[in-house]
Amino acid sequence: MPNPADRVRELEFKLGSVEGPFPGHDLTGQARCINGVLQAFLGPVEPGQKIEAVPGSNSNVPLWILGSSLFGAQVAAAYGLPYGFASHFAPQALDDALATYRANFQPSDQQKTPYALIGVNIIAAETNEEAEYLATSQQMSFANLVRGDRKLTQPPIDDIDTYWTPEEKMRASHMLNFSIIGDADTVKRGVEALLARTQADELMIVSDMYDVDKRLRSFEIIANVLKD
């Protein structure tokens, strides 16, 4: 992705500020520019250097490539960077992208071996029925996306089929293909199956729910599952 002017200040803020409280693990600073400029800005200031990242200089924030296609996988492999795949909303090319990334990976100073992160939607609750109910908020959000009508997350409803058309259901469900919805046991089985399939090194978990307390509880259940 190019760096339009209106993103420069945002990138400067992210590249410097996120590394402070979360050293060594910056996903918001995923590489938008792949020609080495960011690596130079995040390293020590060299004599005669005319442009300095403030904050950011000498932070050595790790760069990532985030993608949803084979192109991103090829770029991450060529530059020896960690690769994050946006399978939480664009899962179509996941398997091919991971295979491409791993097969073509070139070691770099930052990363000696391939390191893959994948996005996954997980909505966990005390029961499968409650989780399915809570998941309707995210399903409505994707139906609205299909309609071109972006809205804030809506409260869950009893019957999602009253909200979307068959075509919207098909398209939204395809985008949400990488979703695990259920109680702790269901989530555990789903995560194990996903890791067995992808051999991912890390998961980026999205738990998009209307009720903040329910969302926090979802993450608690997920955390307990992953500890086991």
What is the role of each PLM region?
Residues 3-6, 89, 122-124, 209-211:
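Active-site-proximal loop/turn and secondary-structure-junction residues that shape catalytic pockets
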Residues 69-98, 102:
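A conserved active-site cap/scaffold subdomain adjacent to cofactor or substrate pockets
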Residues 1, 63-66, 83-86, 114-121, ...:
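Hydrophobic faces of well-ordered beta-strands that scaffold small-molecule active sites
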Residues 40, 75, 79, 100, ...:
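Alpha-helical structural signal in soluble globular domains
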Residues 57-67, 175-184:
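Active-site mouth loops of central-metabolism enzymes
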Residues 195-228:
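Generic C-terminus detector
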Residues 15-52, 93-199:
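An alpha-helical appendage that flanks or caps ligand/catalytic pockets
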Residues 6-20, 79:
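Acidic/polar active-site rim loop that often engages polyanionic ligands
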